[in-house]
Amino acid sequence: MSKTDWNASGPSRPSPSAHWPSGKLWQHGQKYQTTQDRSGPPTRRRRQAVRVSANHASQQLDQLKAVHLASAVRDLERAMTTLKLWESPQEISRHQALGYSVIMFMITAVKRLRESKMLTLSWFNQALMVTAPSQKETMNLKTAMWILANLIPRDMLSLTGDLLPSLWGSGLPMLKLQKEGRSTSS
């Protein structure tokens, strides 16, 4: 029977049961070489190492941090909502213009983090310009941002923009103002 028998898959194709020698062609009178007949040591294949680029690993780490940051922002949002419910309504009188408290500034910042994932110095400076007439609101804004910078884990701060990392290591703004007030009044 020839190796090019007719089969069901196609008349011109060789039969799948026919085994073809690999490598060299077989010649008449020559014995087909098996792995046991080969002389010399077996050829070794080089083991291919899986290489992950530093850029890829960095991207994966950033993605993991972004997921953790989103989780932290959700937790902060829940906490801020709870704090807002606990805030007493007597603090704001009817005749007084509505001012932002520390909690309200934190709620605003957390919402901005959730939506745009960034808190920048330019946004902070704009908010300071709006609250400039009221010393108390300005202080509340600075305190809220400082608290937020210290609530978010340090390794994730770089993903939030340039505002929170710059506030992380600094002291509490109220303490700085009190120290400045004492030095100017003396």
Swiss-Prot record:
A GO CC term attached to the entry: host cell nucleus
Places the protein is found: Host nucleus; Host cytoplasmic vesicle
Keyword annotations from UniProtKB, A to Z: Host cytoplasmic vesicle, Host nucleus
Region spans: Disordered: 1-45
InterPro entries in alphabetical order: Paramyxovir_NSC (IPR003875)
Physiological role: Ribonucleocapsid-associated protein that interacts with the phosphoprotein (P), thereby increasing replication accuracy and processivity of the polymerase complex.
Similarity annotation: Belongs to the morbillivirus protein C family.
Subunit text: Interacts with the phosphoprotein (via C-terminus); this interaction allows C to associate with the ribonucleocapsid.
Protein name: Protein C
Gene name in the database record: P/V/C
